[in-house]
Amino acid sequence: MRDRIPARGQAAIIGNRTIKAFDHTLSTTFLISAVYPLGPAALILMPMLVGGVIDDLGFSEQQAGYVAAVEGMGLVLASWVAALWVRKVSWTSMLALGCIATALLNLLSANLDEYVPFLVVRFLAGFSGGSIFALTVAALGDNRHPDRAFGVAQVVQGAMMFVAFAAAPYILAQWTVGGLYYMLAAAAALMLLALPLFPSHGAQRIAVGGAGGDAPDYTALIWTGLIASFLFFSSIFGFWTYIERVGQAAGLATDSIGLALGISQFAAIVGAGAAAIASNRYGRAAPLILALGGQLLVLWLLVGRFTPATFYFGAGLFQALFVLANSYQLGVISKIDVKGNFLVLATGFQGLGSAVGPGIAASLIDHGDYSRINQMAALFCLVGMLMFLFVIHRTRHVGSPLAENRVSAAD
């Protein structure tokens, strides 16, 4: 029986199986991308939240770092649990549950000022946000062109976070850190509007037979990529969590720091746009090498005293290259993830890095000296990127595992 290519909303015929087609259209990609930032939003805003809980709630710098760490741990746990359900249950039902829980937990956070209850609530908020994040990553990874889909998602995320960072100094001044949590609650409630058009299930994936008809096993390489994701995100969030404090230690004004972080989100749009436009045109190794060099440059520049212009440049380049690299890293794992479950685990390892990184960074602060954080971030970034380059080299001849891509190629 000849395989049939599905039209939008129809089913694919593969052998004797009928498979519901996944919607790869740009409009659906943008819809998924609009929900994508909600999961890690608090972690991305952590520089402003850290400053807020220190200044408004009286937490120490170490306590603030542990708030970031425990929220990241909630995201990690949610991602690991999501690997068990993401291919089995309705995506729209889980998205509704995640959005409602995230909204309520952020409302509760806005009205707490005791450290231990605050930690517990932020852990739960990390779990609900992590469930949303894992779901959207799975949906984007099911696209025929995952590098491009993740690039689009990063563009949308950059635009949303640019607005959030630009508004954060005003919100902190008028309503303290609680205002930022109210903003996150409102965003979660707003995402419920996406439910009617959000995909209810993912795309079908198939294994390509190797010699003797057996499917090749890429498990070891996938785990290498997952560990590399952990190291890379430890580097990124270990430094990013304290970048606002790094700016203050350099003598920069609060408004200048907030503007720089807002500009960094605009720069992230540029980096994500580059990934979306380039897709796999230049391979995956070259963009990651570019990102590695740029990240190391920023970590060298933002040490000790520096000018506002240097801070604007460094924060912007850091975010642009972070989202560029993230798009290609997820594309690397999606390419060899036959069942589509490891890609969800990737968000867990990213979340683990975003949790462990701030915790390690907190332990490296020495009486207002943040330079050892830069050193840690540089080391983790270098090792993680080299591991990804190894995976890329070993899988350079591997094709897509998506069933619908196989159908198209066979027609």
Name what the model sees in each region.
Residues 77-113:
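Conserved MFS/SLC helix-loop-helix module at the cytosolic interface between two early adjacent transmembrane helices
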Residues 123-156:
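Cytoplasmic helix-loop-helix junction between adjacent transmembrane helices
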Residues 47, 222-262:
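Extracytoplasmic gate region of multi-pass secondary transporters
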Residues 78-90, 271-283, 365:
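Helix-to-loop junctions at the C-terminal end of transmembrane segments
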Residues 143, 152-200:
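Helix-loop-helix hairpin linking two adjacent transmembrane segments in secondary transporters
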Residues 285-328:
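C-terminal transmembrane helical hairpin of 12-TM major facilitator-type secondary transporters
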Residues 336-370, 377:
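A late C-terminal transmembrane helix in Major Facilitator Superfamily
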